[in-house]
Amino acid sequence: MTENIASLFASTITRLSPAKLNLFLHITGKRADGYHNLQTVFRLLDWGDYLHFSVSNDAVISTIASELTSNQFCHQLLILDGAEAITTSIEDNLIFKAARALLAFAIQSNTLPEQLAKVHITLDKHLPMGAGLGGGSSNAATTILVLNEIWQLNFTCDELIKIGATVGADVPIFIFGQDAIAMGIGEELTTIELPDQQYLVLTPNAHVNTAKLFAHPKLQRDVAPLSVATIKNQYADYVQTLTPPYHNVFTPVVTNLAPAVADALSYLQGLEAQTLGTARVTGSGSAVFLPLDASVATNEKLVAKWIADAPCTAYIVGNLK
């Protein structure tokens, strides 16, 4: 490692790993590869997990004439910490998978630097697992972005999005790093400008397996596709309220399978008249949210009552700026 790199990364790098909301979520068809084509608008939040990357200034691995695989490199280069960071098998961990995918791309493209520094990654977990907030995917994306800097791989955003898509369908949006219209399996991203917004987010203690939801016979998979231009022009139909054809196809399925999600959504629906917004599910659940009109978002006493009365853990969060 050169002196300037050692100096640049002598201290720990801390990054927000943000949550996301799906303002609507449509499935427009099933692909030949078994995945589903979708259309959604991702809204990134100023709330999430934090990842801390501590880089060793002297512990490096030489890549010269090395025959190590990306998997073997990861086992030598990474130390993962944090109660939620370690899974039964480290190779099933999304942070590990993200680093492995990044190194695999570097090996394939013959762009590995001569040395790679060892990195200690600590996950400070705040987002609940399996909530439709993108926590694990966001952790993976943050890992890809920061390790690309630390190891000076110099991959472009488009290349990193391609790498992220091999890790998970929601990873690309967090590499993209801004609100976007998403199509395909989530990797076809187009920037969209949205007004600043506050949200009341509820995270019921429920989790329904995503594969089970996608396989459910009552899941709608044939929503008529909309053009990017239409979605941009009709943003008023899904930003605050939710007007047909905009909806989340998972809502009837997940609320049927998970009563706690139904209860949380019902609670928010009871606040719609006061907030001038439409309550909805994000992703495939279990989290639900309600956009708040600016006139009520600043009413601290009222908002505190909503949080206190909620049937589960509740948060007030804003969009990422």
Residue spans for each PLM region:
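Conserved glycine-rich phosphate/nucleotide-binding loop
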Residues: 1-16, 293-321
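ATP-binding N-lobe of GHMP and related small-molecule kinases
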Residues: 2-129, 149, 153-158, 203
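Short, basic/glycine-rich phosphate-binding loops at helix/coil junctions
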Residues: 61, 68-88, 143, 165, ...
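Short, conserved aromatic-histidine micro-motifs
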Residues: 62-66, 156-174, 303-321
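Contiguous, small/hydrophobic- and glycine-enriched helical/loop subdomains that border
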Residues: 117, 140, 144-181
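Glycine/serine-rich anion-binding loops at beta->alpha junctions
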Residues: 122-151, 278-292
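Conserved, helical-rich catalytic subdomain that frames metal- and/or nucleotide-binding sites
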Residues: 174-176, 181-278, 303-304, 316-321
